[in-house]
Amino acid sequence: MGNKIAVIPGTFDPITNGHLDIIERAAKIFDVLYVAVLNNSSKKPLFTVEERMEMIKQVTAHLPNVAVESASGLTVDYAAKRGATAIVRGLRAVSDFEYEMQIASMNRTLNAEIETFFVMTNTKYSFLSSSMVKEVAQYQGDISELVPEMVNRAIQVKFNK
């Protein structure tokens, strides 16, 4: 059997300690892990895709089996092109599960060869989202425990602090 390849998709605008926790845990399970940075047209991003990719590359530099790429279109198609057999998704709460289950079911319908793996977020990050980080930062709240240090600095620059 060849390498176990997985994809973790997301907008990561910005990457949080919760995202990083899921990436680090998945990197222990899979031989190759692609972090697919999505350009979600329904969201107005704080950071460009390129900026997000660079931040993720920096905070995952200690993980030699992690590759960071941009992706568009269906995640299941991207996963198939990369030879992945798994899509990894982090779950914060039961409310996440309902939405993620619908996506996983659709992905399975589109490509039965690719499984979705749900990873429960560490409880200390169960409340955390990129949107929340941006909102707190916008109002000068302390986000230093919520994001990696270099991401914190980048956010401070964006909000001109």
Curated annotation (Swiss-Prot):
InterPro entries reported for this sequence: Cyt_trans-like, PPAT, Rossmann-like_a/b/a_fold
Enzyme class: transferase
Positions that bind substrate: T11, K43, T75, R89
CDD domains linked to this entry: PPAT
Keyword terms of this UniProt record: ATP-binding, Coenzyme A biosynthesis, Cytoplasm, Magnesium, Nucleotide-binding, Nucleotidyltransferase, Transferase
Residues bound to ATP: T11, F12, H19, G90, L91, R92, E100, Y125, S126, F127, L128, S129, S130, S131
UniProt-recorded Gene Ontology molecular function terms: ATP binding; pantetheine-phosphate adenylyltransferase activity
Catalytic reaction equation(s): (R)-4'-phosphopantetheine + ATP + H(+) = 3'-dephospho-CoA + diphosphate
Recorded metabolic or biological pathway in which this protein acts: Cofactor biosynthesis; coenzyme A biosynthesis; CoA from (R)-pantothenate: step 4/5
Keyword field contains RNA-binding: no
Any one Pfam family match given in the protein's UniProt record, by short name: CTP_transf_like
Primary localisation category: cytoplasm
One GO BP annotation of this record: coenzyme A biosynthetic process
EC number: 2.7.7.3
Function comment: Reversibly transfers an adenylyl group from ATP to 4'-phosphopantetheine, yielding dephospho-CoA (dPCoA) and pyrophosphate.
Similarity remark: Belongs to the bacterial CoaD family.
Name of the molecule in the record: Phosphopantetheine adenylyltransferase
Organism: Listeria welshimeri serovar 6b (strain ATCC 35897 / DSM 20650 / CCUG 15529 / CIP 8149 / NCTC 11857 / SLCC 5334 / V8)
Lineage of the organism: Bacteria, Bacillati, Bacillota, Bacilli, Bacillales
